[in-house]
């Protein structure tokens, strides 16, 4: 008989032990290194922060990034459990992952999802917005993924705009199932990560709506291929493999051939006027 042991209680943040350690010494392969701050959750070193003095113009956040790259090379086992890396010199505060380039370390510009004052990411906004206990656990569980074809996967941390927008969209979806079925509009500027927001959204829908079937419909074949490819790269995170419908008949078969789950990609051209709906099921999200 086997038992499941959960290393982190995501439902109740207060049931976990959070320890912030300054200058934790780690020795590996003769290398003695002391990262500035490590956040341990239940004994796991999940967040590493490298800090630089704001009073020294020649040393800033970029130097903190380079220091983390050296840690990854010198004490690699420190990063076996790492989820988030932070670089900060008080004026610049950014978060990324072990595969993020410097340009992919991002600011966190809001404490609570209020977008009225996000021009600059202040020190307190970054830390209070991202590292509230319950929110940090939510990020660890639902907003970090690996994307790749198995050769060299990329570890991706959601941006603050993705986090709050997806969370709001999930709540709207819950309301929609009990009202008119309309979930609303999720608007993104170009290049701000809308396809990854869709992946995070699909991941959370599985739990929020009790494993619905998700149909992703676009108006262009190239966009259908692009989104399908992105979702396929994130299949382990989604815990299922997406499929593309090849025809209207195939789409109908894919919908009626299951009672739950499934992520199906199709174009609007596969739909036409008809007397019968493609499916009578209620647990389908388009």
What are these regions (language model features)?
Residues 61, 106, 272-286:
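Signature of the SF2 helicase/ATPase Hel1-core->accessory helical subdomain module
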Residues 216, 264-266, 286:
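Hydrophobic positions in the central parallel beta-sheet of the AAA+
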Residues 221, 242-252, 267-273:
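Conserved helicase motor
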Residues 246-264, 276-281:
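Conserved motor-coupling elements within RecA-like helicase/translocase cores
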């Amino acid at each position: 008989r086997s038992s499941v042991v959960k290393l982190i209680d995501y439902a109740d943040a207060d049931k976990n032990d959070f320890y912030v350690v300054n200058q934790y010494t780690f020795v590996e392969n003769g290398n003695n290194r002391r990262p500035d701050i490590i956040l341990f959750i239940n004994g796991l070193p999940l967040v590493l922060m490298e800090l630089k003095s704001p009073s020294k113009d020649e040393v800033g956040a970029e130097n903190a990034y380079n220091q983390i790259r050296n840690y990854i090379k010198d004490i690699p086992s420190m990063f076996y459990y790492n989820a988030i890396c932070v670089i900060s010199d008080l004026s610049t505060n950014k978060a990324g992952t072990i595969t993020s380039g410097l340009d992919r370390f991002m600011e966190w510009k809001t404490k609570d999802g209020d977008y009225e004052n996000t021009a600059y990411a202040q020190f307190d906004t970054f830390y209070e917005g991202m590292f509230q206990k319950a929110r940090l656990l939510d990020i660890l569980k639902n907003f970090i993924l690996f994307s790749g074809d198995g050769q060299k996967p990329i570890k991706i941390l959601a941006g603050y705009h993705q986090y709050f927008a997806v969370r709001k969209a999930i709540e709207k979806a819950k309301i929609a199932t009990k009202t008119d079925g309309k979930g609303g509009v999720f608007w993104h500027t170009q290049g701000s990560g809308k396809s990854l927001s869709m992946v995070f959204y699909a991941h959370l829908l599985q739990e929020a709506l009790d494993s619905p079937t998700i149909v992703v419909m676009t108006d262009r074949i190239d966009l259908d291929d692009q989104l399908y490819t992105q979702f396929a790269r994130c299949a382990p995170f989604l815990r299922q493999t997406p499929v593309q419908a090849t025809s209207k008949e195939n789409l109908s078969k894919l919908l009626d051939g299951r009672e739950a789950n499934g992520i199906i990609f199709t174009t609007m051209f596969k739909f036409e006027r008809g007397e019968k709906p493609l499916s009578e099921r209620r647990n389908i999200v388009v």
